[in-house]
Amino acid sequence: MKKPYIGISGSILLGSAGSDVDLPRSYVNLDYTRSIEEAGGIPIIIPFTTNLEIIQDTVAHLDGLLLSGGHDVYPLHYGEEPLQKLGEVWPERDHFDFALLKAAEERQIPIFGICRGMQVLNVYRGGSLYQDLSYDETCTIKHAQNQTPELGTHTVDIEFETNLASAIGRSTWVTNSHHHQSVKTVGKGLQVVA
């Protein structure tokens, strides 16, 4: 059986010391590639680019797309002005991810968003975000943990009979969070299941 090629949206990392200062590097978190390998896929890192032809040609070879984490999504993309607690934004990365989404949807391949990736998908589909969790009066759980990423710190309830519940084999999950934003309005065609 052919292993699926899963593209991962890449970001850019700048060195901060020595000969690496201002030397941009394409990267993704190692957890993304390892998780895809453990699930039986082949991870393909998609380097940041503004070249739409390269984006389309790359996605044409993929069986699925993982939108990775990173900067906050630029609020003007969802019709809001930046508020005081907005983090660092990178509008060019937003456009890169939007182009990946467009190409993936045209090919009708599965898309999975983690952290910023889920937020980008929501904004791409016309949804909006809380620029900081402090602006959401219903948020009571601590989402910006001061723990190691491997330590589960709060429970997530998952709706029965959803792809997510089927994939993990249960309806609750103890996880960690390192977020300061969340979905405000859900984008077209999307459904909150956890």
Enumerate the language-model features and the residues they cover.
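Hydrophobic, aromatic-enriched interface-forming segments
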Residues: M118-L121
